[in-house]
Amino acid sequence: MADSENQGPAEPSQAAAAAEAAAEEVMAEGGAQGGDCDSAAGDPDSAAGEMAEEPQTPAENAPKPKNDFIESLPNSVKCRVLALKKLQKRCDKIEAKFDKEFQALEKKYNDIYKPLLAKIQELTGEMEGCAWTLEGEEEEEEEYEDDEEEGEEEEEEEEAAAEAAAGAKHDDAHAEMPDDAKK
């Protein structure tokens, strides 16, 4: 597109004329089946003929409700809408081609990587412990071990206190020492 087309005309009549010219250009390039864009938009047979030639997605196959709004638009606007739809179809075809080529390229390079990944797997093998660790890992392991040891010591103290309490109940009630005195 030229820069003058991107800027847009200053008057609405110029905009309509520019849009109509663009629509006619698209119709001529797109291989319209003769006639002007008004007859192509209003003729359901020509639209069905175009749709039968192109493969359709399930969304395109779904029945489309008649919209009174579109039918109430002027013919020049209908022509622009038709031109935009055709341009969108072209864009969709290009995008589909890109996706297919991209998938083929991914597959090609995945096949190239397979031997390398197999060698890496062979060298690394299964997860094995190694003789060295990173400094951060050592600190984390020490903290974890300290927490476990503290937890075990607390459990042992609680068990000892529970046993002492059970033994004290069996002994004379006056012989008990307060908890503060035991420590």
UniProtKB/Swiss-Prot annotation:
InterPro entries linked: NAP-like_sf (IPR037231), NAP_family (IPR002164)
Gene3D superfamilies in UniProt: 1.20.5.1500
A Pfam entry, by short name: NAP
Compartmental location: Nucleus
Chain intervals with Acidic residues compositional bias: 135-161
GO cellular component term of the entry, any: nucleus
Biased composition annotated in UniProt, kind: Low complexity: 7-21, 28-49
Coiled-coil residue windows: 81-107
Region (Disordered): 1-71, 135-183
Biological process annotations from GO: nucleosome assembly
Swiss-Prot/TrEMBL keywords: Coiled coil, Nucleus
Descriptive protein name: Nucleosome assembly protein 1-like 5
